[in-house]
Amino acid sequence: MGAYTTAPCDLEMGPEERTVVLIEKKSSTGWMWKVSVALLIAALCFAGVLLFAWYWNGKPEILIHSGQSEALTKKDHAEKTDPHSTLKRISSKAKAAIHLEGSYDEDEGLKDQVEWKNGQGQAFAQGGFRLVDNKIVIPHTGLYFVYSQASFRVSCSDGDEEGAGRHLTPLSHRISRYSESMGSDVSLMSAVRSACQNTAQEDSYSDGRGWYNTIYLGAVFQLNRGDKLETETNQLSELETDEGKTFFGVFAL
């Protein structure tokens, strides 16, 4: 938009001959506004290009991290729901701990109880714990978490006399403590479960070859140095001794 000013005239010529000349003064705001708009458009375009490049370059990395996070989440969930892995992880961090794997062969070794193995599979002992005569020896007086699991697979065929007899024989698993101060064995924990149960249970299922059942024991006890812990289990011929199915352990708190 232009502005106009009046040019000076000769006063001696009189008002009749007075001439007025209008001179247009160009405004400086017009071209500055156009330059600002152009710079703004250029900046927006540049920002759009940068955003587009960042999205496509970062997308594969985001997908990779997302996949890794999902895999780790599934792995953590599996470990949390598996008592064997959870107890193994906790006990391995304790200063004094022992974790044993169970084995049974009626033709070899102990015939009337589970044979506990150290240094086999995930089994270990540290902090003074010892395995003596198939018993765990407590190294120091204090609080300890004692645990054990026994897994069974029992044939429950009604047409089999031996299988029918198992209907009447429950599964049992017990942890006993021997202390010199008491001079005798004392039961710390025990559990009894029906061998053949056609109704749904949390710790039993069938695969067509037999019923699987698990007995788990675990609690905190005040134990003395030199105390000995052992297990007692029936129906040993039905015991499942694959790695992680039958175990026995203690760790200090």
From Swiss-Prot:
<keyword id="KW-0735">Signal-anchor</keyword>
<dbReference type="GO" id="GO:0005164">
    <property type="term" value="F:tumor necrosis factor receptor binding"/>
</dbReference>
<keyword id="KW-0472">Membrane</keyword>
<dbReference type="GO" id="GO:0005615">
    <property type="term" value="C:extracellular space"/>
</dbReference>
<dbReference type="Pfam" id="PF00229">
    <property type="entry name" value="TNF"/>
</dbReference>
<keyword id="KW-1015">Disulfide bond</keyword>
<keyword id="KW-0812">Transmembrane</keyword>
<keyword id="KW-1133">Transmembrane helix</keyword>
<protein>
    <recommendedName>
        <fullName>Tumor necrosis factor</fullName>
    </recommendedName>
</protein>
<dbReference type="InterPro" id="IPR006052">
    <property type="entry name" value="TNF_dom"/>
</dbReference>
<feature type="disulfide bond">
    <location>
        <begin position="156"/>
        <end position="196"/>
    </location>
</feature>
<comment type="similarity">
    <text>Belongs to the tumor necrosis factor family.</text>
</comment>
<comment type="subunit">
    <text>Homotrimer.</text>
</comment>
<feature type="topological domain" description="Extracellular">
    <location>
        <begin position="58"/>
        <end position="253"/>
    </location>
</feature>
<dbReference type="GO" id="GO:0016020">
    <property type="term" value="C:membrane"/>
</dbReference>
<dbReference type="GO" id="GO:0005125">
    <property type="term" value="F:cytokine activity"/>
</dbReference>
<dbReference type="InterPro" id="IPR006053">
    <property type="entry name" value="TNF"/>
</dbReference>
<keyword id="KW-0202">Cytokine</keyword>
<feature type="transmembrane region" description="Helical; Signal-anchor for type II membrane protein">
    <location>
        <begin position="35"/>
        <end position="57"/>
    </location>
</feature>
<dbReference type="InterPro" id="IPR008983">
    <property type="entry name" value="Tumour_necrosis_fac-like_dom"/>
</dbReference>
<feature type="domain" description="THD">
    <location>
        <begin position="96"/>
        <end position="253"/>
    </location>
</feature>
<comment type="function">
    <text>Cytokine that binds to TNFRSF1A/TNFR1 and TNFRSF1B/TNFBR.</text>
</comment>
<feature type="topological domain" description="Cytoplasmic">
    <location>
        <begin position="1"/>
        <end position="34"/>
    </location>
</feature>
<dbReference type="GO" id="GO:0006955">
    <property type="term" value="P:immune response"/>
</dbReference>
